A protein has these predicted regions:
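C-terminal capping/lid region of NAD(P)-dependent oxidoreductase domains
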Residues: 3, 300-307, 315-334
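Glycine-rich beta-strand-centered segment in the early N-terminal region that forms part
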Residues: 27-45, 49-93
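A generic alpha-to-beta junction signature in SAM-dependent methyltransferases
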Residues: 143, 210, 233-234
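Short amphipathic alpha-helix with an adjacent loop that forms part of the alpha/beta core around
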Residues: 201-212
Length: 334
């Protein structure tokens, strides 16, 4: 069995380039006891990969999750014909032993056979992004009916999901995104207010949208935008820090700066917690998938994907999400 995979050719400097990744082909060995062979059906590109890549060695397979079909198996827990979601990397075929394979510490799990939902959802609203939205918002922010929730990166795979859960919980939702087109889409999803950070003054826009302050903040970007939000939070507000995409491509010359937030954390007794969903919530993984599935089937949770056809286009799709080109979840169909 031949496998194609993208390996790290050069460490990223600033915005990733297609030449930083190299497409190689190799012959896979026969599987041994305890192993199973999968073929990718859908692959994912996500912003966290930009931050994690520094932990790879040159020549290693680029990290990433995929939904794959089991073609061969000598592991009774992973039978032939079943579909699995796993952190197998940017590769068309992979041999797994059922354990966590890379620095994300995310083991493969079998996709339920009776879910009757599109397989690609297990990379989005029923996968790592969906679980990040679920646990980050509900466990850390704990929004209550009538409260105000602000989410940055609102047009991305995690952000648009956070906003929808907040609406399910009876909250007023403000999404911050980078285009008027995405803003209009978010309004159609039910967001109460949308701010275009590229064209609007964030401080003025927040004061207008939420004059009574902010109770919960789901932070996907960091930087000065987060400072603006945190300065407007109410007493005992809660902050879930999921990502910091504003600095992922930064270099020493253009590292983002932001106003101090410590006085506001102290004065308003704010609760702020960063989290890595695959580490903190692995023992509750299916809880989020089950609930998100229920909301999806009830029509309360909408799915949005930007699909790229062709395995060879993975680097281009990855660069696209770092530029905010995607709406919702970015998916590659090989």
């Amino acid at each position: 069995m031949k496998a194609k995979r993208f390996v790290l050719e050069k460490y990223f400097e600033g915005m990733p380039k297609e030449s930083d990744l190299k497409l190689v082909e190799e012959e896979l060995p026969e599987i041994t006891d305890g192993e199973f062979l999968v073929e990718a059906v859908y692959l994912s590109v996500d912003p966290y990969m930009r931050a994690y890549v520094s932990g790879l060695k040159l020549g290693q397979t680029m990290i990433g999750c995929q939904v794959a079909k089991i073609l061969q198996s000598k592991n009774s827990s992973y039978p032939v014909g079943r579909y699995v979601s796993g952190q197998f990397g940017w590769t068309t075929h992979f041999i797994s032993n059922g354990k966590a394979q890379d620095i994300t510490n995310y083991p493969p799990f079998l996709i339920p056979e009776d879910n009757n939902v599109p397989l690609s959802l297990f990379l989005g609203i029923l996968g790592r992004p969906g679980n990040s939205a679920y646990f980050g918002l509900l466990d850390i922010c704990n929004p209550q009916p009538g409260e105000t929730v602000v989410v940055t990166g609102a047009g991305g795979a995690v952000g648009y999901h956070v906003g929808q859960i907040a609406k399910i919980k009876g909250c007023t939702v403000v999404g911050i995104t980078g285009s008027d087109e995405k803003g209009a889409w978010l309004k159609r999803l039910g967001f109460d207010h949308v701010i275009n950070y590229k064209t609007e003054d964030i401080s003025l826009a927040l004061d207008k949208a939420v004059p009574e302050g902010i109770d919960c903040y789901f932070d996907n970007v960091g930087g000065e935008i987060s400072s603006c939000v945190i300065q407007r939070m109410n007493k005992y507000g809660r902050i879930a820090v999921c990502g910091s995409i504003s600095m992922y491509n930064a270099t020493a010359e253009n590292y983002p700066t932001a106003r101090m937030i410590q006085p506001f954390l102290v004065t308003n007794e704010l609760y702020m917690k960063g989290f890595i969903v695959g580490r903190t919530y692995l023992n509750r993984w299916m809880e989020a998938i089950d609930q998100n599935t229920k909301w999806y089937k009830e029509g309360k949770l909408q799915n949005q994907e930007t699909v790229t056809e062709g395995f060879e286009h993975m680097p281009k799709a990855f660069i696209g999400i770092m530029s905010g080109d995607n709406w919702g979840k970015a998916i590659i169909k090989p």
